[in-house]
């Protein structure tokens, strides 16, 4: 059966992504000096104005204005005359108590194990996914879209393409046949540029200097539609054209249109929030299942209740590609191999470190520098299942 899947990516200067980076840079500052910091901050930015709001409980007071300026400058923006404001208070004491002491501990349910001592920071369902489309075990459209924006950003920073700015986007549609990527259907690239930039030259430069290398995994054919700045002139961009807000690029952050999303954003949240930490764990589990060759595709869903340590749902879907056992058998093995309480997730993935600014652009998954991308549970899975 033939199907089409699409994914998009944005560059570091896209307004929403700048806000994500500011939020995660603030989080990193807190974690650098106090690994137990509780952070949930949102950022809104528009012409000449940046607002930070949320809850921060930490033994360290981050230099928010300094962080904002640093991120803006690193993303290619001038900070002269910028207005900044903060509306930050401490985490709700009710939430803090529920997270610090789990319901299992409060109700004396079962053994009072340290792994079950802390509760989830919120309710929700988090989804992780892996497939054998690519060496990263990620969907092909997602990998290609991020490669395009990475190359575009590198060309801007190095001056390899001149007179372009940091606001840009890419979108890739891939044709699948019987669940496998077979051809590149379309590519869309939009890149902000200077007023004097020749658009035909820009089109040629992006095709030659960006797409040629970015699309090596699945090169275009003669029928692939390639659209460069299809709106025409793209001079007014960045915060002059759009208002940025944290948490508005959820599908860019994850897997594209192929995989559902539980709805919880990542950036600006410490990993006591299962919105973030459980999404990383779900990816870790799914990737190890595919790496173990138990399935060609695997989607792992974890659901939590606020203040409760153990997940209220663990579900696995291999979409009929399972090779060893039924999906419910895989789901039953997960708690035996992976720790899925908040304490276990934080410790096994080392999520109290200041590593989050780098996650906030070019996707949270499929990047070997992150601990949830390890495939070190393959043997343990095989022992538990075979």
Task: Indicate residue ranges for each PLM-predicted region.
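N-terminal, positively charged regions that mediate nucleic acid binding
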Residues: 1-40, 45
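Alpha-helical support elements that line or immediately flank enzyme active sites
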Residues: 12-31, 133-150, 269-293
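A short glycine-rich, hydrophobically flanked beta-strand micro-motif that places a catalytic Asp/Glu
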Residues: 37-41, 168-174, 224-228, 294-305
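Glycine-rich anion/phosphate-binding loop at the beta-strand->alpha-helix junction
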Residues: 197-289, 293
């Amino acid at each position: 059966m033939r199907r089409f899947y699409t994914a998009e990516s944005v560059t570091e200067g896209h307004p929403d992504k700048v806000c994500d980076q500011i939020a995660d840079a603030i989080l990193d500052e807190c974690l650098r000096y106090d690994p137990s910091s509780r952070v949930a901050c949102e950022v809104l930015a528009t012409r000449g104005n940046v607002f930070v709001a949320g809850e921060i409980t930490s033994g360290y007071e981050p230099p928010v204005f300094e962080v904002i300026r640093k991120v803006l400058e690193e993303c290619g923006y001038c900070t002269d005359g910028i207005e900044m404001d903060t509306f930050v208070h401490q985490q709700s004491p009710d939430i803090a108590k529920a997270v610090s002491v789990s319901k299992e501990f409060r109700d004396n349910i079962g053994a009072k194990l340290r792994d079950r001592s802390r509760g989830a920071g919120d309710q929700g369902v988090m989804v992780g996914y892996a497939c054998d489309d690519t060496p990263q075990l990620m969907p092909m459209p997602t990998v290609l879209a991020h490669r395009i924006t990475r190359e575009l950003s590198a060309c801007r920073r190095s001056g390899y393409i001149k007179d372009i700015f940091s606001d840009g986007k890419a979108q890739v549609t891939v044709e699948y046949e019987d669940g496998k990527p077979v051809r590149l259907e379309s590519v869309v690239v939009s890149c902000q540029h200077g007023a004097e930039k020749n658009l035909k030259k820009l089109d040629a430069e992006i095709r030659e200097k960006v797409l040629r290398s970015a699309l090596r995994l699945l090169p275009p054919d003669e029928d692939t539609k390639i659209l460069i700045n299809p709106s025409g002139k793209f001079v007014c961009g960045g915060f002059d054209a759009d208002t940025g807000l944290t948490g508005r690029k959820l599908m860019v952050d994850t897997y594209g249109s192929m995989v559902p999303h539980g709805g919880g954003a990542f950036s600006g949240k410490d990993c006591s929030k299962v919105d973030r930490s459980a999404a990383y764990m779900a990816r870790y589990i799914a990737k190890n299942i595919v790496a173990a060759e138990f399935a060609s595709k695997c989607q792992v869903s974890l659901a939590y209740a606020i203040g409760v340590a153990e997940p209220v749902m663990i579900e696995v879907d291999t979409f009929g590609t399972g090779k060893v056992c039924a999906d419910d058998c895989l789901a039953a093995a997960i708690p035996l191999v992976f720790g899925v309480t908040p304490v276990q997730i934080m410790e096994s993935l080392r999520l109290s470190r200041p590593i989050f600014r780098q996650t906030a652009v070019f996707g949270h998954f499929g990047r070997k520098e992150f601990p949830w991308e390890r495939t070190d549970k393959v043997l343990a899975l095989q022992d538990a299942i075979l």
